């Protein structure tokens, strides 16, 4: 099954995976306390605005994760004191689904004292608080559903397992978590760009 890009949001940990048929030459890099999806050196040049973006960023003491440029305004709104749910809803509504050939949904999640997952599609906006690991993807599973991946344990293993989930066309994955006491713990991220 082809899910496209997907997130799994848990209470203290989140996963992001890029799966792609159109732009497989991408990787996740760490820079300036963010995780960013960028083309690899082998990638053909493109002016497609949906190929490179921050997929993880800290907002206040929360972790914001998503499949595009909406990650930045969500984190910025949280930094300004917005409640997590409102920051997620406002940014998704403002930026809407991607205006590509597939009307690709935007997906995002927030990990913190209250964790949320959201999606904006051409036909719906869904924002949910979560209490168990929850998956939402750009294709097929485009409504929040219980994830089939445990988010407990070693963060490096979680990133690799996310990459290895049996969904088609994996490109790269990352996992991020709060280590320590709840939201006040350090944020630790792990990238897995394939073998």
Swiss-Prot record:
Keywords: Hydrolase, Purine biosynthesis. Pathway: Purine metabolism; IMP biosynthesis via de novo pathway; IMP from 5-formamido-1-(5-phospho-D-ribosyl)imidazole-4-carboxamide: step 1/1. GO terms for biological process: 'de novo' IMP biosynthetic process. It is an enzyme of class 3 (hydrolase). It comes from the Archaea. One of its GO terms (molecular function) is IMP cyclohydrolase activity. It catalyses: IMP + H2O = 5-formamido-1-(5-phospho-D-ribosyl)imidazole-4-carboxamide. InterPro entries: IMP_cyclohydrolase (IPR010191), IMP_cyclohydrolase-like (IPR020600), IMP_cyclohydrolase-like_sf (IPR036795). Pfam families: IMP_cyclohyd. The keyword Hydrolase applies. Its EC number is 3.5.4.10. Belongs to the archaeal IMP cyclohydrolase family. NCBIfam families: PRK04151.1, purO_arch. Catalyzes the cyclization of 5-formylamidoimidazole-4-carboxamide ribonucleotide to IMP. This is IMP cyclohydrolase. It comes from Haloquadratum walsbyi (strain DSM 16790 / HBSQ001).
């Amino acid at each position: 099954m082809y899910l496209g890009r997907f997130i799994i949001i848990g209470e203290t940990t989140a996963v992001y995976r890029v799966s792609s048929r159109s732009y497989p030459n991408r990787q996740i890099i760490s820079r300036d306390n963010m995780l960013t999806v960028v083309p690899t050196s082998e990638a053909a040049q493109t002016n497609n605005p949906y190929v490179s973006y921050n997929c993880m960023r800290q907002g206040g003491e929360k972790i914001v994760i998503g499949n595009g440029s909406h990650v930045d305004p969500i984190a910025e709104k949280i930094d300004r004191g917005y409640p997590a749910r409102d920051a997620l809803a406002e940014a998704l509504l403002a930026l809407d689904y991607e205006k590509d050939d597939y009307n690709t949904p935007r997906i995002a999640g927030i990990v913190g004292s209250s964790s949320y997952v959201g999606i904006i599609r051409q036909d719906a906006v869904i924002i949910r608080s979560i209490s168990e690991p929850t998956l939402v993807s750009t294709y097929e599973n485009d409504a929040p559903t219980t994830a089939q991946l445990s988010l407990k344990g070693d963060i490096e293993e979680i990133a690799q397992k996310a990459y290895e989930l049996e969904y088609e066309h994996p490109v790269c994955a990352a996992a991020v978590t709060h280590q320590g006491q709840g939201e006040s713990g350090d944020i630790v991220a792990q990238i897995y760009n394939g073998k």
